[in-house]
């Protein structure tokens, strides 16, 4: 792992993932979590301030990047909830089935190499009747914008930690045999080429 991945990328991701419009999407979703939470892509802990300690008993965060995790130290210290980290990607999570009440995924499916396998892992670990909460960015509905997503993604992925701006998030859920109760779609302020924002609560 080079200097960029160790020192520059974690700072850039922490800053980018905490900008106002993205933070507002997190604030809409995360407070709905309850019980034992499995958070995929916990990263620098951007979601931690939005968990309700009266509703959440424990957070199990999954993230393979030790360097971005170090940037969560202050947010972890300020959080009243017990936090455990598993330093792996989301495709193979060493947890028993049916132990989580809620799965939270925010701006992480874009980076997981095998996102469908990761979604199946989430459902394995989720208790019957549990819920998956997510906000993501993905494939733009406008074909002209989606063409640009396809053009920039090879380079964008290299500089943004594997992020794929044009992923078809609803299609990934369909491939994992998951259905939405509700799905809100919108462009948030910023370059549209970075994708449509999707929210499921």
Where do the protein language model's features map onto the residues?
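Conserved alpha-helix/loop element of class I SAM-dependent methyltransferases that forms part
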Residues: 16-36, 46-50
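Class I SAM-dependent methyltransferase SAM/SAH-binding core
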Residues: 38-40, 44-92
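A short acidic, Gly/Pro-enriched loop at the edge of an enzyme's catalytic core
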Residues: 91-103
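A short glycine-rich, Lys/Arg-flanked "PGG" loop and its adjoining helix->strand segment in the class I
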Residues: 116-128
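Conserved beta-strand signature within the Rossmann-like core of class I S-adenosyl-L-methionine
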Residues: 129-137
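Short alpha-helix
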Residues: 161-177
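Conserved small/polar residues in nucleotide/adenosyl-binding loops
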Residues: 199-201
